[in-house]
């Protein structure tokens, strides 16, 4: 039976590799395993060994490193010799089994079956379900949007879907503050990454927002960006012995990069390196800070302009157009499409021409009759349509309400498609989006302690009092008296303690200017008053901040108060709390709005109570009064705050330095009057049609509801738990819809992505994930699930299995073969062909006569009748039935080959129908809307042609198989 030189593998120790017989007698056989440098002696009667024999069509490796494509297998005196052609040169070659590579592995299902590498039946089932789920997720229209750790806000989802599915989107996101521009950008990016259209992304932000973006992308989207600054880049700077620069481009080292635009403006060399690197998508936050004028664009604007010209996809996040002024607004649009927005004066003329149409839309939205002028404006824009019958339906009192509604909606749809900037500009306002709470301001006036008064006097005599010293006197006092503690006498602390005790059942967020202030406050509350508190500042790691946030979010045993520095709270929202204490007042309106915005979000269920303790006759009091009575910035959002701060800032500075100066009341009146004027101009300039397009209406609402239905999906929960079990992760149900996942010593892989060293808590519940940022929110989009599916489907888990079928109606010993084939196409990721033809599992269930019973016998139904087989019995069945199994595999190949044309035809029809419809729509609209870019249409047509070509090349491969043997019991 055994001949010296033959190759065998161990059924019980597959990891030893390919063994070679070195000795054999009547009782034992000795096998050496060169790859593992091990030797085993087996008793002949129970040797767990399987003979290795490759087949025609296999590609095998020689011990010398070259590969042979097997064309013929010859056996001579117990030895196997393989004949064929070398893969590298095509020359004919001979490879005796003695010269096979010792590290051979079996990846084909049939090879694994016949080499005793047989898996458990439940793993075969998990593999098939993983393939099914993978197919479904590739085709899901919700992919890239449902996994976000955020509330499902219809207008955000609408913009994300509309823009995220485009080829190389170039848009301006200009929602009002608090409406989620960052979330919209993240969802657009996520879809582009999932589709493969985008791989390398650069995010440019003001320096103060870098960490906010880093946190938002990680916590909300599971996207791990890298922060680039001078210190990081300098590590790549190198010179040779002659002093020549041989530096590598640091920006080529990571795919997802965040950088400060302020830093790049001041560092020409780094800006040059950014331009030299290739990017698929550019995202610019606070883009309105890029100063532009027709004759003198800023350095930052010119840099972004060059970058935008060489980057296919561009997202600009900016303040609303009305805040910017038309010239600045035009400059942003020109970055997106310089050919379309080439002349400022032409743009202004076009905007003026369009205003009457926007007014007419407001009339339509209010269900009022259209005036003669409004009808003319609409008819002129829709010149190719006969609008007269539509106007009659709208204006006639005899028209049925439902008919009027239908016509109004049709007209609005037509006008949206022709809107001047509707494809490049999205803007929602708070007036157009429901769900915001009221804001209530409480000013607490306290007497300034003598210690602060004296410190300010002394510093004044020394000529060194700064604005920060007066706004934050505790820092000045501590600097001058290191041994003393400001917290021992500051009346704000006693007020805060009393306030917390009077509101024990409420969550309260306290924001301070500095981390040191927050740390000192939290220590006093916790140690002196035993108040459950947490601290949150920029010196903490993201994990530490997550824990603090989670402690604050717990309703029963959690912290009553979270004390945060202003920088530490960036990127975090706490809408489950409704009390905000501004222990230190921000020194400009934008920062004030940012602080209030931590609570003032969509999803906030209560009115927000804003408490500002400040000292009487102080700079704090002047600033708080100006914010409240001049800007009304505490009780309403103030989109014109930055403009008013620029306009009145110098005059305000005088009152800040001298709080008791005459004329302050008159100054407040003038500020408020100007605020009302700007507010009216903003309202007058609102483009209702643009808002309607950006809002998404009922379609957006339906999208949110569809995603909500997928939350806590039982199929996902069951699959995830089975997946974790197979991977070897320990699971502990904590209740409250959360599970602790812990690594063990018997995992399939040493490190599973997303699992911490000790443990990770996960949930399938969106609301819990929103409250507890230390808990991972699992959806089909989460890396833990996606990586788990990849681990199963790309590896050998469940590729071959053998089971017993308990069925009294079948003769004992009846052989069935369940084969899972994959139909797929090897196309560039950027084509996003998985929408039409994802890797598709096709199940074939053959009886012993070769008839396919898959349509009659469901996978789940069959699974319930199967029983496991131990490994020894499975190996025995595989050996005994090898010839019959091979025949059934041959028949299954004929079956899948017959099914392939139908699958290709359906995918081709889907692709052609979808892409042709979009192409027709864009081509039709291009005649009436200049914002349809010619290159976008060309790219779509090329995509259609290439997609159909690649789908036609689709083929099949055997992924996994299960042999089933019937038994009566």
Swiss-Prot record:
Binding positions for ATP per the UniProt entry: 175-182
Motif DEAH box per UniProt: ranges: 285-288
Helicase ATP-binding domain: residues covered: 162-339
Cell inner membrane is among the record's keywords: no
EC number: 3.6.4.-
Keywords: Activator, ATP-binding, DNA-binding, Helicase, Hydrolase, Nucleotide-binding, Transcription, Transcription regulation
Any Pfam family: SNF2-rel_dom
Top-tier EC class: hydrolase
One of the GO biological process terms: regulation of DNA-templated transcription
Gene Ontology molecular functions: ATP binding; DNA binding; helicase activity; hydrolase activity, acting on acid anhydrides
Domain Helicase C-terminal: 492-663
Family indicated by similarity: Belongs to the SNF2/RAD54 helicase family. RapA subfamily.
PANTHER family membership: DNA ANNEALING HELICASE AND ENDONUCLEASE ZRANB3 FAMILY MEMBER, SWI_SNF-RELATED MATRIX-ASSOCIATED ACTIN-DEPENDENT REGULATOR OF CHROMATIN SUBFAMILY A-LIKE PROTEIN 1
Function statement: Transcription regulator that activates transcription by stimulating RNA polymerase (RNAP) recycling in case of stress conditions such as supercoiled DNA or high salt concentrations. Probably acts by releasing the RNAP, when it is trapped or immobilized on tightly supercoiled DNA. Does not activate transcription on linear DNA. Probably not involved in DNA repair.
Subunit structure comment from the entry: Interacts with the RNAP. Has a higher affinity for the core RNAP than for the holoenzyme. Its ATPase activity is stimulated by binding to RNAP.
The protein's name: RNA polymerase-associated protein RapA
Species of the source: Actinobacillus pleuropneumoniae serotype 5b (strain L20)
Gene field: rapA
């Amino acid at each position: 039976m055994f001949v010296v030189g033959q190759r065998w593998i161990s059924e019980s120790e597959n990891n030893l590799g390919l063994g070679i017989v070195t000795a054999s007698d009547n009782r034992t056989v000795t096998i050496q395993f060169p790859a593992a440098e091990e030797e085993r002696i087996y008793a002949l009667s129970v040797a767990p060994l399987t003979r290795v024999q490759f087949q025609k069509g296999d590609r095998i490796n020689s011990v010398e490193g070259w590969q042979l494509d097997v064309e013929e297998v010859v056996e001579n005196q117990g030895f196997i010799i393989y004949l064929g052609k070398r893969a590298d040169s095509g020359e004919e070659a001979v490879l005796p089994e003695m010269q096979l590579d010792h590290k051979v592995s079996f990846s084909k299902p049939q090879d694994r079956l016949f080499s005793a590498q047989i898996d458990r039946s439940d793993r075969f089932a998990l593999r098939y379900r993983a393939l099914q789920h993978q197919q479904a997720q590739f085709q899901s229209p919700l992919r890239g949007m449902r996994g976000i750790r955020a509330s499902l806000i219809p207008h955000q989802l609408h913009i994300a879907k509309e823009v995220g599915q485009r080829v190389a989107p170039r848009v301006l996101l200009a929602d009002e503050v608090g409406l989620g521009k960052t979330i919209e950008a993240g969802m657009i990016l996520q879809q582009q990454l999932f589709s493969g259209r985008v791989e390398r992304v650069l995010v440019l932000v003001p320096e103060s927002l870098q960490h906010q973006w880093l946190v938002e992308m990680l916590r909300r989207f599971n996207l791990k960006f890298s922060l680039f600054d001078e210190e990081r880049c300098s590590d790549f700077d190198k010179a040779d012995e002659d002093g020549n620069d041989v530096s590598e481009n640091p920006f080529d080292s990571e795919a997802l990069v965040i950088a400060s635009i302020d830093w790049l403006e001041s560092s020409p060399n780094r800006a040059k390196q950014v331009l030299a690197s290739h990017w698929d998508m550019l995202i610019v936050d606070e883009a309105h800070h890029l100063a532009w004028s027709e004759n003198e664009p800023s350095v930052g604007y010119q840099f972004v302009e060059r970058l935008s010209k060489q980057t296919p996809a561009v997202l600009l996040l900016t303040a609303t157009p009305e805040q910017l002024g038309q010239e600045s607004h035009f400059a942003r649009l020109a970055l997106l499409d310089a050919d379309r927005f080439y002349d400022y004066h032409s743009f202004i003329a076009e905007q003026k021409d369009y205003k009457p149409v926007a007014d007419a839309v407001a009339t339509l939205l209010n269900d009022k009759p259209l005036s003669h002028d409004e009808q003319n404006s609409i008819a002129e824009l829709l010149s190719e349509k006969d609008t007269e019958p539509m106007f009659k339906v709208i204006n006639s009192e005899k028209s049925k309400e439902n008919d009027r509604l239908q016509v109004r909606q049709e007209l609005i749809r037509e006008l949206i498609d022709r809107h001047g900037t509707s494809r490049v500009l999205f803007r929602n306002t708070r007036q157009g989006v429901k769900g915001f709470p009221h804001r209530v301001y409480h000013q607490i006036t306290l007497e300034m302690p003598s210690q602060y008064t004296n410190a300010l006097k002394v510093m004044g005599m020394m000529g060194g009092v700064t604005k920060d010293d007066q706004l934050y006197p505790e820092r000045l006092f501590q600097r001058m008296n290191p041994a003393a503690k400001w917290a021992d006498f500051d009346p704000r602390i006693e007020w805060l303690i009393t306030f917390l005790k009077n509101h024990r059942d409420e969550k309260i967020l306290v924001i301070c200017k500095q981390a040191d202030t927050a740390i000192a406050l939290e220590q006093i509350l916790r140690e002196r008053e035993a108040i459950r508190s947490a601290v949150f500042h920029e010196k903490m790691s993201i994990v530490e901040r997550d824990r603090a946030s989670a402690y604050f979010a717990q309703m029963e045993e959690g912290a009553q108060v979270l004390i945060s520095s202003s920088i530490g709270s960036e990127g975090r929202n706490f809408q489950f709390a409704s009390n905000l204490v501004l222990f230190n007042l921000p020194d400009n309106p934008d920062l004030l709005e940012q602080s209030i915005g931590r609570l003032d979000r969509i999803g906030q269920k209560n009115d927000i109570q804003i408490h500002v303790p400040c000292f009487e006759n102080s700079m704090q009091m002047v600033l708080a009064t100006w914010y409240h009575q001049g800007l009304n910035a505490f009780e309403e959002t103030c989109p014109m705050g930055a403009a008013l701060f620029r306009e009145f800032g110098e005059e305000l500075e005088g009152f800040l330095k001298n709080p008791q100066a005459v004329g302050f009341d008159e100054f407040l009146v003038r500020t408020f009057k100007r605020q009302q004027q700007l507010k009216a101009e903003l309202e007058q300039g609102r483009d209702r049609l643009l808002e309607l397009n950006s809002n998404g209406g009922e379609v957006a609402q339906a999208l949110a509801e569809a995603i909500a239905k997928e939350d806590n999906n039982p199929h996902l929960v069951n699959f995830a738990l089975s997946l974790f079990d197979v991977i070897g992760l320990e699971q502990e149900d904590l209740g409250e819809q959360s599970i602790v996942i812990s690594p063990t010593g018997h995992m399939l892989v040493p490190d599973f992505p997303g699992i911490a060293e000790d443990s990770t808590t996960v949930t399938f519940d969106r609301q819990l994930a929103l409250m507890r940022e230390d808990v991972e929110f699992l959806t089909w989009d989460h890396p833990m699930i996606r990586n788990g599916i990849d681990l199963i489907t790309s590896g050998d888990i469940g590729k071959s299995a053998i089971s017993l079928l308990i069925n009294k109606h079948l003769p004992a010993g009846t052989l069935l073969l369940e084969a899972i084939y994959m139909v797929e196409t090897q196309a560039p990721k950027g084509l996003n062909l998985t929408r039409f033809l994802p890797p598709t599992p096709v199940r074939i269930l053959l009886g012993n006569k070769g008839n396919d019973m898959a349509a009659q016998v469901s996978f789940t139904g069959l699974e319930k009748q199967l029983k496991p087989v131990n490994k020894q019995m499975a190996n025995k069945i595989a050996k005994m039935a090898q010839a019959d199994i091979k025949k059934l595999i041959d028949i299954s190949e004929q079956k899948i080959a017959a099914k392939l044309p139908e699958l290709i035809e359906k995918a081709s029809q889907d692709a052609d129908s979808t892409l042709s419809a979009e192409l027709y729509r864009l081509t039709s609209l291009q005649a009436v809307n200049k914002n349809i870019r010619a290159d976008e249409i060309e790219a779509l047509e090329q995509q259609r042609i290439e997609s159909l070509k690649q789908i036609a090349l689709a083929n099949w491969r055997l992924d996994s198989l299960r042999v089933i043997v019937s038994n009566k019991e």
